């Protein structure tokens, strides 16, 4: 059968080159996963300053330890721990504010009985009473005096095997570690004037900011690691740590380094980012009460603003990633409001904004390092969207909000209709905000996030202000421009080509001959026969099929097949056991409110139909994985695809993979499946309709859910090419034999072709309806 092409794609789509797979993920426009691209992932050139790039959240980067520094006297910076590492007993450090506080620290070796030792403190020789009863631990002792000519008194001790102590000035106090390792902790003993207090140190030391207090605790209690990551290889003077700060202007070009051919330019720019979300709202066929999709789309926006008196022409592209799919089903009747899928961005989503302007900073953005940005947050609030139904009150989706916070910036390339622009991609993480969104006149309410229905809330644009800085390697001669390196992003001409191709495909449905379609659907279409009729690709079928298989691997059908067992068991078990209900037909509105008693669970037929719909979606997988000679919906969709590929004038090697993948997911969305038990047929549809009827008379009988659950597990599942309504209509108007009825129930292609060749209007209308559903 023609659906062999889908089976062949599935069975051969699991061998792929990893680099191609990475490129595929990076180029994907809409996906339900988060892609964390590296800072140089979008260009073909290496960074000037080699580094690890971005790291996963679970990866720990050990902070660099600032030091070691040579013994010296200096004004210890406020909010910095001074971690001292002496190697021998004696005076370690001392300090004073020169008015009313003098403090000193001495180190005593193990096993020292109480004794008096001489130390030179504050320029004077003094005797201090010291002792250390431990035979293994060294002991730091803190002495303090309150007058210039006063005597030192012992205030605190720290017993340690690591010979490390630390103190810090903050909030007008001196903080010090006390206790015994590995349980030593910080405390304070002095109130001083932090600005005028100097420290004299007799040993090597390190500096740690207050934000790394936990790391300082670790060093004090456990010692320095064997090979710690330090700023200096050997101890250096503390003066080498002094940095000359220059006040940077918001917008300036600085020559960092220069040779005869190249120079490094630092560009500092303030920036105003304006962006908009785009969306797509697609209605399903029928009476106009059902929507197929509400989704986000990339949106380009051009604008101008003034920077330091200069008018800047800017271009942004806004896209989203990691969207969340929601749905709403108001019932199974054609007049019941429902949305098959609508996208919402939440905490697990990302927003990408690619920015370019015509300033000097973007003219040579190829070799870039030290790229950074500081941006304000932005709140995006959803507006009202009214679903204009043909009859009845109109539901309104309203509310929803998210806050965008800057997460990072990388290089990217924006593609327009005329040229490629090297640009900056700003990544934003999301947090949900008030209010939540809801759909009026439905039970859907209290959901947080920003839905795709009206994400711009009727405002012209959202705006984010900030600044960025980068160092770019450019030619010394400003008259030359570094060539732009092409790269892959989500905005390519491919999307435009696919849009035109979809329109052509949908228009070709009127040109398909029904009899030839049935013949084609019965043929075993393989990879070569499927694509051999395409003139532009006949010589590249082998290489093209590799791309098709890689694309098909990520389709919904491929993912669903891999989870077939779980999907079937979960869906089947969700339907109530030991219960019989009446079928739901097109005119059975009076039965919708009928209650079904299932143990202690009281539900409506409408609820049961929703569960039946879930089972029906899994029945495609059940049929797909079993070989049969009967015609299936996938056979018809593959035959329609083959016919349209042969007739298309716009098909190309780059668009075929997307078309093949989309066709497997979107062709014939309203499918009906049946299982046969002796003289009774059970038929369920994706739309939630379900029937049970006699195969000889087509009279309806109660739908035995328990029996149905057993049949879909043990019996063949058949595509209802000719569904129950069509069969009953055919029998009432023309009359058919029991043999013909069984063959139509089993979707026998020979019998179908006979009815078509005899111009039976009921059968022809049904097949034409299926072809019309083969839309992209």
Curated annotation (Swiss-Prot):
GO biological process, one term: virion attachment to host cell
Organism: Rotavirus A (strain RVA/Rabbit/United States/ALA/XXXX/G3P11[14]) (RV-A)
InterPro entries in alphabetical order: ConA-like_dom_sf (IPR013320), Rota_A_VP4 (IPR042546), Rota_VP4_MID (IPR035330), Rota_VP4_MID_sf (IPR038017), VP4_concanavalin-like (IPR000416), VP4_helical (IPR035329)
Signal peptide: none
Keywords, alphabetical: Capsid protein, Coiled coil, Disulfide bond, Hemagglutinin, Host cell membrane, Host cytoplasm, Host cytoskeleton, Host endoplasmic reticulum, Host membrane, Host-virus interaction, Membrane, Outer capsid protein, Viral attachment to host cell, Viral penetration into host cytoplasm, Viral penetration via permeabilization of host membrane, Virion, Virus entry into host cell
Annotated motif DGE motif, positions: 308-310
Protein name: Outer capsid protein VP4
Disulfide bonds: 318-380
Region (Spike head): 65-224
């Amino acid at each position: 059968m023609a659906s062999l092409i889908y089976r062949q794609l599935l069975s051969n789509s699991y061998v792929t080159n990893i680099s191609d797979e990475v490129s595929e993920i990076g180029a994907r426009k809409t996906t339900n996963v988060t892609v964390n691209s590296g800072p140089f992932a979008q260009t073909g050139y290496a960074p000037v300053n080699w580094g690890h790039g971005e790291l996963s959240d679970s990866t720990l980067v050990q902070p660099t330890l600032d030091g070691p520094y040579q013994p010296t006297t200096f004004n210890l910076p406020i909010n910095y721990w001074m971690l001292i590492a002496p190697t021998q007993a004696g005076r370690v450090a001392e300090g004073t504010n020169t008015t009313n506080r003098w403090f000193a620290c001495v180190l005593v070796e193990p096993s020292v009985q109480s004794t008096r030792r001489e130390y030179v403190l504050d320029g004077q020789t003094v005797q201090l009473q010291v002792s250390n009863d431990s035979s293994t631990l060294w002991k730091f002792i803190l002495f303090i005096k309150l007058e210039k000519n006063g005597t030192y008194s012992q205030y605190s001790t720290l017993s340690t095997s690591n010979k490390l102590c630390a103190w810090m000035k903050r909030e007008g106090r001196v903080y010090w570690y006390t206790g015994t390792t590995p349980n030593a902790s910080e405390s304070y003993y002095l109130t001083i004037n932090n600005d005028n207090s100097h420290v004299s140190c007799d040993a090597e030391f390190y500096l740690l900011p207050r934000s790394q207090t936990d790391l300082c605790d670790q060093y004090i209690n456990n010692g320095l690691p064997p090979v710690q990551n330090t700023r200096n290889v050997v101890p250096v003077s503390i003066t080498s740590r002094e940095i000359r700060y220059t006040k940077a202007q918001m917008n300036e070009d600085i020559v960092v380094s220069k040779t005869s051919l190249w120079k490094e330019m630092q560009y500092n720019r303030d920036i105003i980012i304006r962006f908009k979300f785009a969306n797509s709202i697609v209605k399903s066929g029928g009476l106009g009460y059902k929507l197929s999709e509400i989704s986000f789309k990339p949106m380009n926006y051009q604008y101008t603003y003034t920077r330091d008196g200069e008018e800047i022409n800017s271009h942004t592209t806004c896209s989203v990633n990691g969207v969340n799919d929601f749905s709403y089903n108001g019932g199974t009747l054609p007049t019941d409001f429902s949305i098959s899928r609508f996208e919402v961005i939440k905490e697990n989503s990302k927003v990408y904004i690619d920015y370019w302007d015509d300033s000097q900073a973007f003219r040579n953005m190829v070799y870039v390092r030290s790229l950074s940005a500081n941006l304000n947050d932005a709140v995006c609030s959803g507006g009202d969207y009214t679903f204009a139904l043909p009859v009845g009150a109109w539901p309104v989706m309203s509310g929803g909000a998210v806050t965008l916070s800057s997460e990072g910036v990388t290089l990217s390339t924006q593609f327009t209709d005329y040229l490629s622009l090297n640009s900056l991609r700003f990544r934003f993480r999301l947090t949900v905000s008030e209010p939540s969104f809801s759909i009026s006149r439905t039970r859907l309410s209290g959901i947080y996030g920003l839905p795709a229905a009206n994400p711009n809330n009727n405002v012209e644009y959202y705006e984010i202000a900030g600044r960025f800085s980068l160092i770019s390697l450019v030619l010394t001669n400003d008259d030359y421009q570094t060539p732009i390196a092409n790269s892959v992003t989500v905005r390519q001409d491919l999307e435009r080509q696919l849009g035109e191709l979809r329109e052509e495909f949908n228009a070709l449905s009127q040109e398909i001959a029904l009899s030839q379609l049935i013949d084609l659907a019965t043929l075993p279409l393989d990879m070569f026969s499927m694509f051999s009729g395409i003139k532009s690709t006949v010589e590249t079928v082998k290489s093209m099929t590799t791309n098709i298989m890689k694309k098909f691997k990520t389709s919904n059908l491929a993912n669903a097949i891999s989870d077939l067992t779980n999907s079937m068991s979960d869906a089947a078990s969700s339907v109530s056991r030991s219960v019989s209900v009446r079928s739901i037909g097109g005119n059975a509105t009076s039965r919708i409110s009928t209650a079904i008693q299932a143990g202690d669970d009281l539900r409506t037929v409408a609820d049961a139909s929703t569960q039946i719909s879930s089972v029906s979606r899994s029945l495609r997988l059940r049929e797909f994985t079993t070989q049969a000679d009967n015609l299936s919906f996938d056979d018809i969709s593959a035959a329609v695809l083959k016919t349209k590929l042969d007739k298309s004038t716009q098909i190309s090697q780059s668009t075929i993979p997307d078309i093949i993948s989309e066709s497997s997911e979107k062709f014939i969305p309203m499918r009906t499946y049946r299982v046969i038990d002796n003289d009774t047929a059970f038929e369920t549809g994706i739309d939630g309709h379900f029937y049970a009827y006699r195969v000889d008379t087509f009279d309806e009988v109660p739908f035995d859910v328990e029996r149905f659950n057993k049949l879909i597990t043990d019996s063949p599942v058949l595509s209802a090419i000719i569904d129950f309504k069509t069969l009953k209509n055919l029998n009432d108007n023309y009359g058919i034999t029991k043999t013909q009825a069984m063959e139509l129930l089993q979707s026998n292609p020979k019998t179908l072709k006979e009815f078509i060749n005899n111009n039976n209007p009921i059968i022809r209308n049904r097949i034409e309806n299926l072809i019309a559903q083969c839309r992209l």
